[in-house]
Swiss-Prot record:
Name this polypeptide is given: Proline--tRNA ligase
InterPro entries membership: aa-tRNA-synt_IIb (IPR002314), aa-tRNA-synth_II (IPR006195), aa-tRNA-synth_II/BPL/LPL (IPR045864), Anticodon-bd (IPR004154), Anticodon-bd_dom_sf (IPR036621), Pro-tRNA-ligase_IIa (IPR002316), Pro-tRNA_synthetase (IPR050062), Prolyl-tRNA_ligase_IIa_type2 (IPR023716)
Pfam families linked to this entry: HGTP_anticodon (PF03129), tRNA-synt_2b (PF00587)
Catalytic activity: tRNA(Pro) + L-proline + ATP = L-prolyl-tRNA(Pro) + AMP + diphosphate
Keywords: Aminoacyl-tRNA synthetase, ATP-binding, Cytoplasm, Ligase, Nucleotide-binding, Protein biosynthesis
GO biological process: prolyl-tRNA aminoacylation
Lineage of source species: Bacteria, Pseudomonadati, Pseudomonadota, Alphaproteobacteria, Rhodobacterales
Length: 445
């Protein structure tokens, strides 16, 4: 993409309404525009990152054997009355009446609707286990929306639902989701720690939240520092192997890690003092096992091998897709702007032409743009007639992991400058070497 043809409405000054770094940089970098309290339009740069995150989530869900579908944002209220949650949910739920005076709602979550889909089409234990998921916009009418996409009213979420014959199978689904989530977040350059948490309005006996440590997080968390040394890495997982998934879950849940709702000071005090930590965290996902909480009242039953009918065991599992943008920025920025991890960057590298209109630099930039694109990479070429300082400031603000700087002096020596945004380190090399280096880096992502 050529920046001269791209829609990137960057702001020079910090917006007064932005209280935290991620909100400030998302507005300044032209990623979002607020349309109402807690409701945003996603502008091209922000939308690209959103789609990168969504793609990683899809890939890891499918890797784990989960099946995508798509449910509507509007739901009939009768489903929620059937489960008993319609009156319990409170004023966060946006309730709507259509022209036929039927009660509807803008879904804050989808347990009732997915249970209705299941009971309409599945009746035998032979069709189990089954896990369905979708990525869809949700709405919760927060009383005080703030912090940009971190606590908006409308948000994009991946929510998945498992249906199993018995408790043991449902716990395997729970473990499978935890393993899948660990891999998902690490691919995004995040360390998201699974912490024992409260189940809230969704309910259930077993739940973990995934939290990214950040001073701007809304959750108070307590943990053993040993958990921050764990890395999922590139291990290959057989998601059908119950023992393997259980072992990974034990590895990640053995160190103490809890939110304030479930914190146990007595247990925490048994950890060596030098490893005890308290901090703030940003919730980016949560997994639940809630047994027959929805299947029993809604009649989601299957016929077993002996002919009896039993309610299925269920769980739900969410990832805050749009919130993840804010969490990544909170965890990865400096005083110049965003620093995108390579896995979610909107463009793989920026090309800065220091002397637009100079034939040698123009030709070199065009060749770089063409060669990077031919290797399957997406460069952002700053071909604007602007000062070098302004171009560098834009690149630093939008946070592309790599920048290739092309100037007359370097081109005369057959060199360009490749700069790492995170470290600030620069290296001169040929254009071909720069293309090869970037292709190699992204081949491993």
């Amino acid at each position: 993409m050529r920046l001269s043809r791209y829609f990137l409405p960057v702001l020079k000054e910090n917006p007064s309404e932005a209280q935290i770094v991620s909100h400030r940089y998302m507005l300044r970098a032209g990623m979002i525009k607020q349309q109402a309290a807690g409701i945003y339009s996603w502008l091209p740069l922000g939308f690209k990152v959103l789609k990168r995150i969504e793609q990683i989530v899809h890939e890891e869900q499918i890797r784990a054997g989960h099946i995508p579908l798509l449910m509507p944002t509007l739901q009939p209220a009768d489903l929620w009355r059937e489960s008993g949650r319609y009156d319990d949910y409170g004023e966060e739920m946006l309730r709507i009446t259509d022209r036929h005076k039927r009660d509807m709602l803008y879904g804050p979550t989808n347990e009732e609707m997915i249970t209705d889909i299941f009971r309409s089409h599945v009746s035998s234990y032979k069709d189990l286990p089954l896990t369905l998921y979708h990525i869809q916009w949700k709405f919760r009418d927060e009383i005080r929306p703030r912090f940009g996409v971190m606590r908006g009213r409308e948000f994009l979420m991946k929510d998945g639902y498992n249906f199993d014959l018995d408790y043991e199978s449902a716990i395997h689904a729970y473990n499978r989701h935890m393993v899948s989530y660990l891999r998902t977040y690490e691919r995004m350059g995040l360390q998201a720690i699974p912490m024992r948490a409260a189940s809230g309005p969704i309910g259930g006996d077993n739940t973990h939240e995934f939290l990214v440590l950040a001073s701007t997080g809304e959750s108070e968390v307590f943990y053993d520092a040993a958990i921050t040394d764990l890395k999922f890495g590139d291990r290959v997982v057989n998601y059908d192997d119950r023992a393997e998934c259980e072992a990974i879950v034990k590895e990640w849940t053995a160190p103490y890690a809890r939110t304030d709702e479930t914190h146990d000071e007595a247990v925490f005090g048994q950890i060596p003092e030098e490893r005890r930590r308290s901090s703030r965290g940003i919730e980016v996902g949560q997994i639940f096992y809630f047994g027959t909480k929805y299947s029993e009242p809604m009649g989601a039953n299957v016929v077993t091998a002996d002919g009896s009918r039993v309610p299925v065991h269920m769980g739900s599992h969410g990832i805050g897709v749009s919130r993840l943008l804010g969490a990544i920025i909170e965890a990865s920025h400096d005083d110049k702007g965003i620093i995108w991890p390579e896995g979610v960057t909107p463009f793989h590298a920026g090309i800065v032409n220091l002397k637009q209109g100079d034939s040698s630099t123009d030709l070199a930039c065009e060749a770089l743009y063409r060669d990077l694109s031919a290797r399957g990479l997406e460069p952002l070429y700053d071909d604007r007639d602007e000062r070098a300082g302004a171009k560098f400031a834009t690149m630093d603000l939008i946070g592309l992991p790599w920048r290739i700087t092309v100037g007359p002096r370097g081109i005369s020596a057959g060199k360009v400058e490749l700069t790492n945004r995170r470290t600030g380190e620069s290296e001169e090399m040929s254009s071909g070497a720069a293309v090869d280096r970037l292709a190699q880096i992204y081949a491993g992502i």
